[in-house]
Amino acid sequence: MSAAVACLDYFAAECLVSMSAGAVVHRRPPDPEGAGGAAGSEVGAAPPESALPGPGPPGPASVPQLPQVPAPSPGAGGAAPHLLAASVWADLRGSSGEGSWENSGEAPRASSGFSDPIPCSVQTPCSELAPASGAAAVCAPESSSDAPAVPSAPAAPGAPAASGGFSGGALGAGPAPAADQAPRRRSVTPAAKRHQCPFPGCTKAYYKSSHLKSHQRTHTGERPFSCDWLDCDKKFTRSDELARHYRTHTGEKRFSCPLCPKQFSRSDHLTKHARRHPTYHPDMIEYRGRRRTPRIDPPLTSEVESSASGSGPGPAPSFTTCL
């Protein structure tokens, strides 16, 4: 008797476990017209579309098969009628679950694996397909399972985020120095003024000895360069001063302006005059000791038009050399 009671208790426990694992079939509310109300209340009817498993994570595949346990004796059934009712209810639920799968024409999903996930951008959003725990698996982009996921580095504050999910940390770095920059020129140290004036109280010094000799004549009052023009007894300490004075007698004007026909006897007078022209440039005038080639400006538009019409162009700029 004790073995039969233990068997019935075990059977009742199995029934309760199977009932808790199975799908619950709710009764549908009656339609407004009253038609089709009894069809949904039948125990063996197919469940509605809302009760069918969706494309999300699958639930239990099917109702597990009940263990084959010998039916209780009539005496035991009278002693425990609730066990008999539980067994009958479990049989009805098992048969109704199998009939629903056969009527719907869909094979139950295998509980060991997932089906192909539906892309989120095509069908429905991920929040409707799966809960928060499974949304990452369904909405993940199609990629190789062997390729490791590379986490993106956090973007620095203020740096623009690059397209594709990469951080813009590399953009915040300073610009690289140009590789083809011109090399720096060495600073030219000026030569020392070695020729100092020997007279007391005079601190002047010169690069050349000839310049020092000319300066010493200012202390001694010596004027070795005298003018040989008739009735002219002027004397000078420097030869260039004598040459400049001599032109006042001859009237020679060897310094001509490159922008106009004017001529001058002194180079400083020419420079002062040439600066008044708006198109003047220092390279237009050659002085003694200048090594650069003078720059010749292109002819003006008016001169080009006049030469094309047949008239001769204006006088070409002449370059002279100072003594």
From Swiss-Prot:
Protein name in UniProt: Krueppel-like factor 14
Lineage: Eukaryota, Metazoa, Chordata, Craniata, Vertebrata
SUPFAM superfamilies per the UniProt record, alphabetical: beta-beta-alpha zinc fingers
Biased composition (Low complexity): 40-53, 94-106
InterPro entries assigned: Znf_C2H2_sf (IPR036236), Znf_C2H2_type (IPR013087)
Cellular component terms (Gene Ontology): chromatin; nucleus
Main location: nucleus
Zinc finger residue extent: C2H2-type: 195-224, 225-254, 255-282
Basic residues compositional bias, start-end: 184-195
Annotated compartments: Nucleus
Region annotation Disordered: where it falls in the sequence: 27-80, 94-116, 142-161, 166-195, 279-323
Residue stretches in coiled coil: none
Family: Belongs to the Sp1 C2H2-type zinc-finger protein family.
Superkingdom to which the source organism belongs: Eukaryota
BP GO terms, sorted: positive regulation of sphingolipid mediated signaling pathway; positive regulation of transcription by RNA polymerase II; regulation of transcription by RNA polymerase II
Organism: Homo sapiens
Keywords of the record: DNA-binding, Metal-binding, Nucleus, Repeat, Transcription, Transcription regulation, Zinc, Zinc-finger
Molecular function via GO: chromatin binding; DNA-binding transcription factor activity, RNA polymerase II-specific; RNA polymerase II cis-regulatory region sequence-specific DNA binding; sequence-specific DNA binding; sequence-specific double-stranded DNA binding; zinc ion binding
Record's compositionally biased regions (Pro residues): 54-73
